[in-house]
Design a protein with these regions (language model features):
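Short, Lys/Arg-enriched N-terminal segments with co-localized hydrophobic residues
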Residues: 20-44
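Phosphate-binding/catalytic loops
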Residues: 122, 128, 134-196
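Acidic, Ala/Val/Gly-enriched low-complexity intrinsically disordered segments
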Residues: 3-5, 9, 13, 37, ...
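Hydrophobic structural packing positions in well-ordered secondary structure
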Residues: 52, 103, 130-131, 181
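Conserved active-site segments centered on acidic
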Residues: 36, 41-125, 190-196
Length: 196
């Protein structure tokens, strides 16, 4: 399990020192997010929110890739994994067909969903809020405000890289985006798992 709230877990990631308050949080309510697979009342869970611009390409890809990773490790009951947008442009839209196609090719399951926007109150609920690029990070901080608990990070920082996960909405290269998402999610899982 994670260390208690009063015990900070410190780790150096991509040259930056992060002091995580890895809190023991209990699942006592549902939020408006539509991507929960299951919630077990009273169970201790790690809560991750992936964020991109529209919540139809990269963040939803990361959501399903991370769910696949934790499931393959027999830990699906230890995580709540969701995704959201910084913008309102695609609210209510399902996952982009290009993301579905690459997930199909990689044998990763996904469910029908609706894009939602990140909100300020998500900060108190989630342990990690993970952006895909520098623009996402600016917009996340604009929505959330002060990151007092060091919860907000860029995905590839966990792979000791400072670069962005490219938006396939523009590049149309969903395979390269998938490779970056898989790398980032794998390293994020390894990081979290080292404290469980």
């Amino acid at each position: 399990m994670f260390v208690g709230e009063t015990q900070g877990a410190k780790q150096k990631v991509s040259g930056l020192r992060h002091n995580y308050n890895l809190k023991i949080l209990y699942t006592i309510f549902l939020t408006r997010c539509t991507c929960y697979d299951k919630l077990n009342y009273g169970d201790i869970m790690v809560k991750i929110m992936f964020v991109c611009h529209g919540n139809i390409c990269r963040s939803t890809m990361a959501e399903f890739v991370m769910k696949d990773i934790v499931k393959k490790n027999g830990m699906e009951n230890d995580f709540i994994i969701c995704s959201s947008a910084t913008s309102t442009e695609e609210i209510g839209s399902d996952t982009h067909w290009g993301t579905k196609k690459i997930l199909d090719e990689m044998g990763i399951s996904y469910t029908k969903r609706q894009a939602v926007q990140l909100k300020k109150s998500d900060y108190e609920y989630y342990d990690f809020i993970i952006g895909m690029d520098s623009a996402n990070m600016r917009n996340i901080n604009r929505i959330i405000g002060y990151d007092k608990d060091n919860k907000i990070h860029k995905l590839l920082n966990f792979a000791n890289m400072d670069r962005d996960v490219a938006d396939p909405w523009y590049t149309r290269d969903f395979k390269t985006t998938y490779d970056d998402v898989l790398l980032g999610c794998t390293r994020l899982f390894d990081y979290i798992n080292s404290y469980i």
